[in-house]
Amino acid sequence: MARIAGVDLPNNKRLEVALTYIYGIGWSRAREICEKTGIPCTKRVGELTPDELNTLRKFIDENYKVEGDLRREVQLNIKKLKDMGCYRGIRHARGLPVRGQQTRTNARTRKGKRKTVGGTKKAKAK
């Protein structure tokens, strides 16, 4: 298994697919990396030479923010929004949708599992 940016890439996958295992690299960026390094996208990770792996590592480290650095930056951006007290920051803090989606129904992904309120039974009249 090849290791790039702290992620083990599976040997049997094509390079463009394997690169998407790295946080911060999607399909289009994986293709772009292959083109700029001159390594064919269809080549399997197990078939890569050590020189090609070093080229990939160096190119990704120099040109892109991936894995831990990217996660840290995203978390800092969210923290900055919360500290400012702006609308988006408040929505993040409350665990509600940030981009204007409705919340009267749905929004379950952001809100989490429903919390049932108990003890609301009415007493029987005699």
UniProtKB/Swiss-Prot annotation:
Keywords: Ribonucleoprotein, Ribosomal protein, RNA-binding, rRNA-binding, tRNA-binding. It comes from the Bacteria. One of its GO terms (biological process) is translation. Residues 95-126 are annotated as: Disordered. Residues 107-126 have a biased composition (Basic residues). The keyword RNA-binding applies. Gene3D superfamilies: 1.10.8.50, 30s ribosomal protein s13, domain 2. SUPFAM superfamilies: S13-like H2TH domain. Transmembrane segments: none annotated. Pfam families: Ribosomal_S13 (PF00416). GO terms for cellular component: cytosol; small ribosomal subunit. GO terms for molecular function: rRNA binding; structural constituent of ribosome; tRNA binding. Signal peptide: none annotated. Located at the top of the head of the 30S subunit, it contacts several helices of the 16S rRNA. In the 70S ribosome it contacts the 23S rRNA (bridge B1a) and protein L5 of the 50S subunit (bridge B1b), connecting the 2 subunits; these bridges are implicated in subunit movement. Contacts the tRNAs in the A and P-sites. PANTHER family: 30S RIBOSOMAL PROTEIN S13/40S RIBOSOMAL PROTEIN S18 (PTHR10871), SMALL RIBOSOMAL SUBUNIT PROTEIN US13M (PTHR10871:SF1). Belongs to the universal ribosomal protein uS13 family. Part of the 30S ribosomal subunit. Forms a loose heterodimer with protein S19. Forms two bridges to the 50S subunit in the 70S ribosome. This is Small ribosomal subunit protein uS13. It comes from Aquifex aeolicus (strain VF5).
